[in-house]
Amino acid sequence: MSETYVLKADLRTRVGKGSSRELRRNGQIPAVIYGDKQEPLAIAVSYKEIFYKIHGGGFKTTVATIEVDGKKIQVLPKDYQLDPVRDFPQHVDFLRVSAKSVVHVNVPVHFKNEEAAPGIKRGGVLNVVRHDVELIVPANAIPEALEIDLSGLEIGDSVHISAVKLPKGATPAIQDRDFTIATIAAPAGLKSEENAEGTAEEAKDGE
């Protein structure tokens, strides 16, 4: 599980575009805390802290504690909006969570031991079908990433979700099939040779 962190926040008494612009001028951005059958709570958080958390990776898989109005609220970032031109954060949605909360979260996939995959050594290409996997997982057990070992994989081999070790209590959100996460694809040169051989064989059969 990722290391948790603390965010200090202020309550927002005003909402709307004018209020949001004023917050940004003062180094803050608007945010909201929702969920757990409670009323949404409008807050303002540090622009700088959110910027580094978002661009540092793992933002949406790490539980945080927000300190606001004398309270400590455990949350999981669920969504954020960026400026379409400059990638600056403009708004964040936080979901209230507790030790008993079970959440849907997209966890990034990391691959290791590429050098130990014979298929890649022979020039095969790692074709990533899914860069992240949606899990249903306890909020206190969200992994930073799913590690996939490529050792021993040959050209044409695939990695399916059934081969991935998941944290205790976690299940994939997609349950109706053993979906593919990655394959070792043949290099373009090898594909061309195979196609040429196949064409030659067909021509020979047609004689």
From Swiss-Prot:
Single GO molecular function: 5S rRNA binding
Keyword terms, alphabetized: Ribonucleoprotein, Ribosomal protein, RNA-binding, rRNA-binding
One Pfam family here: Ribosomal_L25p
The keyword ATP-binding is annotated on this UniProt entry: no
Gene Ontology biological-process annotations: translation
One GO CC term, this protein: cytosolic large ribosomal subunit
InterPro entries associated with the record: Rbsml_bL25/Gln-tRNA_synth_N, Ribosomal_bL25/Gln-tRNA_synth, Ribosomal_bL25_b-dom, Ribosomal_bL25_C, Ribosomal_bL25_long, Ribosomal_L25_dom, Ribosomal_uL5_bac-type
Secretion signal, residue range per the UniProt entry: none
HAMAP family, per database record: Ribosomal_bL25_CTC
Function: This is one of the proteins that binds to the 5S RNA in the ribosome where it forms part of the central protuberance.
Summary of subunit composition and partner proteins: Part of the 50S ribosomal subunit; part of the 5S rRNA/L5/L18/L25 subcomplex. Contacts the 5S rRNA. Binds to the 5S rRNA independently of L5 and L18.
Protein name per its UniProtKB record: Large ribosomal subunit protein bL25
Species of the source: Brucella canis (strain ATCC 23365 / NCTC 10854 / RM-666)
Taxon lineage: Bacteria, Pseudomonadati, Pseudomonadota, Alphaproteobacteria, Hyphomicrobiales
